[in-house]
């Protein structure tokens, strides 16, 4: 039980995912967060950034035994991550397409909460197909927007285009940001804990803003009704 709890904790830590699971676990986590409804808690943004940073610091390192080595060339890393992200969204879309009605009547659980579907629905109705592109940069939203696109039966060709474009910008922006920062400041590889905390805070800001905007709108609507 103790081992299982430690394993779950490691899944929240980007550095641990990369160090213990390498490229294989990294790709699986990106796939799961973008394609499986219970993957919403996984640290996609910070994971991409840290992967880019560790790739850069590994290239700069002269130590064979460095704990921060992540020997995956950036030209292999980015296409691999993109493939996982695109495939994940296709799985989410198909899942929503086939189980939409059942999903909306399903009871809430630790792995699934309908409020996330409604959050994705609100985001989708405001921005249309662009929600699939922009949603890539928002935790939770990026997990449930492709599922909702399947529920509303968005045309597959359109979804495929939005999926690829969104995945490309999400993967390349965050991974290359980490990569070039690591090239500029290689010492950051020794202070990953601080980097991860900063990234988590930054990634949660858009979700918090959206949440409070929705709350304010609901309060305003109730006030107008009275």
List PLM regions with ranges.
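Pore-lining and gate-forming transmembrane alpha-helices of multi-pass membrane transport proteins
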Residues: 163, 167, 194-198, 202
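Transmembrane alpha-helical segments of integral membrane proteins
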Residues: 171-182
